[in-house]
Amino acid sequence: MFCLLVIVLLALQSEINAYNISPYPNSVLNFPELEGNRRSSYFGFSLVIREKSIMVAAPRANSSLEAQRNISEPGVIFRCYFESGNNCSPYNIDTKGNYKGMPNDGLLTAKNKDFRWLGGAMDGGTRDSDKFLVCAPRFYSINNENDYNNGMCYWLSDTPKNIDSTEVMEKWPLRIEKKQVLKLADTNLIPYYSMGELGLSAHVSDDNSKLLMGAPGIDQWKGSVHLKQEVPSIKTSSGRQRRGMNTNRKCNECNPEPKNFGQEEFSYFGYAVSSGYFDSSNLSTVLYVATAPRGNNQFGEAYIFDIYEDSIYKYHEFRGNHFGEYFGYSVLAEDLNGDGKTDVIISAPLYALRNSYDDGAIYVFINKGSFTFEERIIRSPAGSGGRFGTTLSRIGDINKDGYNDVAVGAPFAGNGSVFIYLGSENGLRDPPSQCLDAPSQQPSKYGSYMFGHGLSRGSDIDGNGFNDFAIGAPNAEAVYLYRAYPVVKIHAIIKPKLQNVNPEEERVNITVCYRLSSKSDSKAKALMEQELVIRIDIDTKSKIKLAVFDEEHGSQMSFKAKAFHEEICSEFQIEMDKRAKFTPIALEMQYELSKKIPNSGDFCEDCAVVDPAEPKFVTEYITFNTGCATDVCVADLKISCINASSTLVLGTTAVLRLTYNITNNGEFAYHPKFSVTNSAGLSLAQVPGNCKVNEAVMVCDLNHGQRMAKGDTDSLTISFDVRQLRGRSLEIQAEVLSARDESNPENNKLTNVLSLREKADIYVSGVQTNDHVVLKESPYTAEVVNYYEIKSHGPSTLENLTVSLYIPVAYKTPDSTNVKHIVTSSPKIQSKYAHKIMPINFIDQNNALANNFAIDHDQSTLLFSATPQHENVGNLSGIVEQNPSISLLNEDLPVNNTLVLNCQDTNVTLCVPVEIRLENGLQLKPEELMNMTVSFTVNLKDADDIWEYFVIQTDLKVHKIGDPTLSSFTIEKKIESNVICKHAEIAIWKIIVSVIVGILVFSAATYALYKRGFFKRAIKDDLKQLIRDSFEDGIIRTEMEENAQSQGDADLDEKLDAYADTTGKCTHV
């Protein structure tokens, strides 16, 4: 699982995500069950691979030997042959049991082999003739009931099939009795050899002349090493003795004393050991490297050194960088870059990345000569807890590229993983070329596999010329063998038969050649013959296909072909389009091996692989006679814009059109193209047919895709959608280019910068929506409701606007500092725009008004709770704004008893300002209405009686962020004022007194007139008598006329006249 994740990550970083090691084990060696084992034997803990077999250590196994039946877990070495069904049998290095004996001649003789961990460390070359070194670091001797954990090693000069126990050599250099425990001057006893643990690490030099064993417990865990060697005559190339060295002090059996080279206590020097050719002035001399992971104050250290009798001479020191990372847990010496000098890899498996633990890392030190090293850290790709670098192994040059490769184990990454790193001219390549995961993700009965804790060297066990290697999984009691596939290199070329093809040619022949090579000496079939898959593409990057193979294949042809060591060539014919004869045509040939290695443990005997770092394609061009002075035409394209403006008023147009002219003043311009982009990422309102848009960049073919000769011109009109355009400026960049060189590239580009302006006409209106207020009686309160509208007539859309409303709430009395409040209720303000309730902000510049108004507002309504109070005017200030005059509305109001409250008159009026902000993308768009409803209660109870009319003039202003002069818009206002009429009420007592006084005055006047005879009316009596007499005469005359008519009296008139004379009255009027 870990490797699957790692491979995914590595695939993103590099094409090298698998290589020539089989991805799954090709065979498995399992622990031969022995009697008495109750826990894991750790079969596979350490490995030494040979030509046809592998030595496998099981340091916790019980022995089947009769002499060791009563010994608990002495450890067993197994030899497993690859050609005999992977059968494993004990390779009995030590056939004897425990021995109880007294010291002899000052040397311990008792041997206790219980839990001695035989095979805890092993080393040896890959040939059967190489020496073989096996150690048991927990071997101990008993003397006077004291256990001395000296450690013991065994070595053989070679590994014959049938081992002779007499040929096994024991190495027990720490058996000196008097050095087991030392007494200091203060009588304290310290362990010296008694906890030495010789063989915790083991190493056999490449020339088989030296055996180096680590003993990190010597002298209170200062640590040291033991060296068995054949002493050569060491001279430099000039015949002079090497600096700092005395050949007389060379030893066959060397036990350096830590006190002689100043080793730090508890530093564990000798924890890991190796050797190599580090001295660039003498590359024939072997020097040693050993680590002390708890040295350097637990930062860890390692030394390159030589040994002389009882001390060492240090040539170079390596130091860890992090406390507790266990720098020096493992060490590997190998020439990684092929320069002949041995490089060094030191692991730190407890190295932790941030927010992680025990990730692990390896420090790679590239030898630059004269004991100077270039350091590089490769951090774990295995994740937290994997302990990358627990084991390191030299696997040789597995891909035959001339550089040695290494394997790095991370046995605690799940069930364990192993990473393959390839050498190169610059050291190790990173990332790894391959990751091998434990075959199973399920834990064994003993827990996680610890796959990778055992790593063998590389050895070609199947004879195909490439090194194979084995991986041990101690907790699974198994060893997995991984074989390597041969690596071949594909050599392929593609080329036209003719150079500079004539423009009139309709067909062109091309030649394709290919062959295989390998640096391996093997003559295996996999190298001799491989099938290739070849694909040829014509002009893949061209949008217009200018050449094809034929109607059947089009511009792509694929085929399979056998490849050998010898080069094979084939010819193909390409049909040319007339448009292509002046344009170079790209031919790209891709190739790969047809047969892939199986994604399983089955090994394919006739398969091979190609180094993923090698190219997988080759490109060539068909070129034509250009008709120019040289093979390469030099054009001189020039671009200009004929209708560009320096200013754009936003909203005046939905589409911005720019027309560009392109002229060629040079030689032929092939594939002329025009591209345009803009700083605002505007989309195109229209895309011409010869253009394509990709991520706001439009690219167009000029001259219908044909070449442009000298003097040719073309033009394009580009239409940008500017409906959503915002900002202060717009930069439009246009460029023309061709497939060939340009003589004057400066005029190929043109940048137009347009200054963006906003312009809008805003209309503001306000009216009172309820009836005019007339207050006739106490408490002289009434609600006033105003409605306001704000509308922009454009053309621009405005943003970052603030609408401010000013409401008069109080006034100052003349010649006084007192303030009288006329708005004492809780004004409610609600605003809507674009179907949204707008938030209201109360602004009190000096907090003075807040003393009188308790504020309670939410997203939709603003409330001011007020109580009328008299305040000192010194604490208040109005809106500072000059206004030359204040009119009294359209109504004819008396000036002397009318009070006008206007927020611009700061000497009289005190106002409450509120704000509505259009922010967070909200914009005032043309013809979209914004409204505001304001209601408040006026209270004129405490107003001065001299005022009969109160005029409240609210004001509304608009501001824009970044436009202090309001140059981007104009405002027309029509806001009606609120007029409140107050008629004073007459007191009852005044009415009663007035009535009584009136009655008294009336009575007195009447009596006076009576006394003066005003009420005597003589003329009235005469008129009554006259009326009465007239009425009586009328009756008499009527009777007389009636009588005369009845008697026919002709003298009636005379009788009437006579009657009139007697009465003295008129008979006619």
UniProtKB/Swiss-Prot annotation:
> Which SMART domains does this entry report, sorted A to Z?
Int_alpha (SM00191)
How does the record classify its membrane topology? Single-pass type I membrane protein
Tissue specificity: Expressed in lamellocytes (at protein level). At the anterior end of the oocyte, expressed in the follicle cells that will form the operculum and the micropyle.
Pfam families in UniProt: FG-GAP (PF01839), Integrin_A_Ig_2 (PF20805)
Q: Which InterPro entries match?
A: FG-GAP, Int_alpha_beta-p, Integrin_alpha, Integrin_alpha_C_CS, Integrin_alpha_Ig-like_2, Integrin_alpha_N, Integrin_dom_sf
- Transmembrane stretches in the record are 986-1006
Q: Which UniProt keywords apply?
A: Cell adhesion, Glycoprotein, Integrin, Membrane, Receptor, Repeat, Signal, Transmembrane, Transmembrane helix
List the ranges whose topology is Cytoplasmic.
1007-1069
Q: Does the keyword Glycosyltransferase apply?
A: no
Q: Which is one GO molecular function term here?
A: integrin binding
Describe where the FG-GAP repeats fall, as residue ranges on this chain. 29-89, 104-165, 184-237, 255-310, 312-374, 375-430, 437-499
Query: What are the BP-aspect GO terms?
Result: cell adhesion mediated by integrin; cell-cell adhesion; cell-matrix adhesion; heterophilic cell-cell adhesion via plasma membrane cell adhesion molecules; integrin-mediated signaling pathway; oocyte growth
- Its signal peptide is 1-18
Spell out the SUPFAM superfamilies in the cross-references: Integrin alpha N-terminal domain (SSF69318), Integrin domains (SSF69179)
Which cell locations does it reside in?
A: Membrane
Positions annotated as glycosylated: 62, 70, 282, 415, 509, 643, 661, 800, 875, 896, 907, 931
**Cellular component GO terms held in the UniProt record:** external side of plasma membrane; integrin complex; membrane
Q: Which Gene3D superfamilies match?
A: Bicelle-embedded integrin alpha(iib) transmembrane segment, Integrin alpha, N-terminal, Integrin domains. Chain A, domain 2, ntegrin, alpha v. Chain A, domain 3
Chain ranges sitting on the Extracellular side read 19-985
Q: What biological function has been recorded for the protein in this entry?
A: Possible role in cell adhesion. Minor involvement in the establishment of the oocyte anterior-posterior length.
State whether it acts alone or in a complex, and with which partners, per the record.
Answer: Heterodimer of an alpha and a beta subunit. Alpha-PS4 associates with beta-PS.
The family assignment reads:
Belongs to the integrin alpha chain family.
Q: What is this protein called?
A: Integrin alpha-PS4
Q: Which organism is it from?
A: Drosophila melanogaster
Question: What gene does this protein come from?
Answer: ItgaPS4
